[in-house]
């Protein structure tokens, strides 16, 4: 940008600034000149000449002195009043007389949960529930709209400024896509599990894009051929080293140590695929399972039964598990049903097999709605989970968090929050 131009960046979905709290700002810049940075309200960042209304008296002047290379500059702000506004954001202005390139503009509160970047009140809400494990990073994002947009855990670690940005499956619009910066990546998820005393349960892509969106997933845009599957299996093997490895000559152990965590995370579970189903899935899953069990026999592997509580894909999955129970420690079931369905199916697991190695992991479940009746129906259903704890070894309500006014998914959510 050239003087007297600048940029105004609204904090994503707005933010709350608290009087007396500190906020760490950073920017990567290239060139020689001055940047003036302040906090304020962005009236309309889409205008060619945007309007801003500063609310913090203190502004910072950053002297940029790297002509040819990118350099990171940082400054800390202390908010001098309270502000919660839809337009709250960062104003960066070039006050010098030369061109400057800027990238990776960041503003983070210093007061976060255990100093690891996550919002303290949300983590404290989660902590109060005494969770035993966390399934991450979620569901369909792992699969991707196509294989090119599938989540790759290796893109989500290391310096945040160097992580590969990726389109999110929940809004893949070509004109207004929802992008993932991977600022919350696998390292942060492992760290979150450690901070909250949870077992990490990462889910990896199995070489198949989202089957719900792609139908039969028969072309290479959506389905990795068997003779090209090995890199995906290697990703799983490398993740085990990243999480559990102690050999400091290993590339992925080195990366974990470089990020500040010398000790292993002691991961015990890995899920292969999110809601995949059918013969094309189990053909690929078997290759993952054989190689992982051969090298890391103590890792518990999670397979999946698809997207429904019953039907052909669910039946096929359990029939496969009955014949290959040595390859799967958990069967991940997902279903979102009506409140009446949950009330009527409290006895669902009474007749499941008990003499098999493959136990149930109810990885996603919720009744469709957010009324008291939904909660009561789910509670009734959960009595069946507890009664059959020898069959249902793990269960996780989903989704975990939802922000008021900013959800794509409204069928059910566990913890609702706003800016404050």
For every predicted segment, state its role.
Residues 208-211, 357-420:
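Aromatic/acidic polysaccharide-binding cleft in carbohydrate-active enzymes
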Residues 211-224, 231, 257-264, 306-340, ...:
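Substrate-binding cleft/loops of secretory-pathway carbohydrate-active enzymes
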Residues 77-82, 86-89, 110-131, 181-196, ...:
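An active-site-proximal structural segment forming one wall of the substrate-binding cleft
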């Amino acid at each position: 940008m050239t003087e007297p131009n600048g940029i105004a960046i609204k904090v994503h979905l707005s933010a709350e600034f608290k009087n007396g709290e500190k906020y760490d700002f950073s920017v990567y810049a290239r060139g020689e000149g001055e940047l003036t940075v302040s906090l304020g309200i962005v009236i309309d960042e889409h205008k060619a000449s945007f309007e801003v209304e500063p609310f913090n008296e203190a502004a910072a002047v950053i002297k940029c002195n790297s002509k040819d290379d990118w350099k990171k500059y940082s400054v800390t702000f202390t908010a001098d009043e309270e502000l919660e506004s839809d337009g709250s954001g960062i104003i960066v202005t070039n006050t010098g007389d030369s061109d400057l390139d800027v990238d990776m503009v960041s503003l983070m509160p210093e007061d976060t949960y255990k100093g690891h970047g996550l919002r303290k009140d949300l983590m404290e809400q989660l902590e109060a529930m005494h969770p035993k494990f966390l399934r991450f990073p979620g569901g369909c994002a792992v699969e991707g709209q196509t294989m090119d947009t599938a989540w790759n855990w290796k893109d989500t670690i290391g310096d945040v400024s160097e992580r590969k940005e990726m389109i999110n499956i929940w809004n893949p619009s070509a004109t207004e896509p929802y992008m993932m910066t991977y600022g919350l990546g696998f390292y942060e998820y492992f760290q979150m599990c450690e901070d909250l005393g949870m077992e990490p349960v990462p889910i990896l892509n199995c070489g198949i894009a989202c089957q719900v969106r792609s139908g039969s997933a028969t072309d290479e845009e959506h389905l990795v051929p068997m003779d090209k599957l090995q890199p995906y299996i290697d990703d799983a093997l490398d993740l085990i080293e990243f999480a559990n490895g102690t050999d400091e000559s290993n590339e992925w152990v080195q990366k974990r140590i470089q990020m500040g965590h010398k000790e292993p995370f002691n991961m015990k579970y890995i899920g292969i695929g999110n809601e995949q189903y059918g013969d094309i899935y189990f053909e690929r899953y078997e290759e993952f399972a054989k190689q992982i069990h051969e090298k890391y026999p103590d890792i518990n592997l999670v397979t999946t039964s698809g997207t429904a509580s019953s039907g052909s894909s669910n039946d096929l999955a359990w029939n496969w598990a009955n014949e290959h129970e040595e390859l799967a420690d958990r069967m991940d079931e997902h279903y979102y049903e009506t409140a009446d369905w949950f009330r009527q199916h409290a006895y669902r697991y009474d007749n499941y097999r008990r003499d098999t190695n493959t136990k149930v992991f109810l990885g996603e479940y919720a009744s469709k709605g957010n009324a008291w009746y939904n909660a009561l129906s789910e509670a009734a259903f959960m009595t069946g989970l507890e009664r059959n704890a020898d069959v249902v070894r793990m269960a996780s309500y989903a989704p975990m968090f939802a922000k008021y006014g900013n959800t794509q998914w409204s069928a059910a959510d566990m913890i609702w929050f706003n800016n404050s």
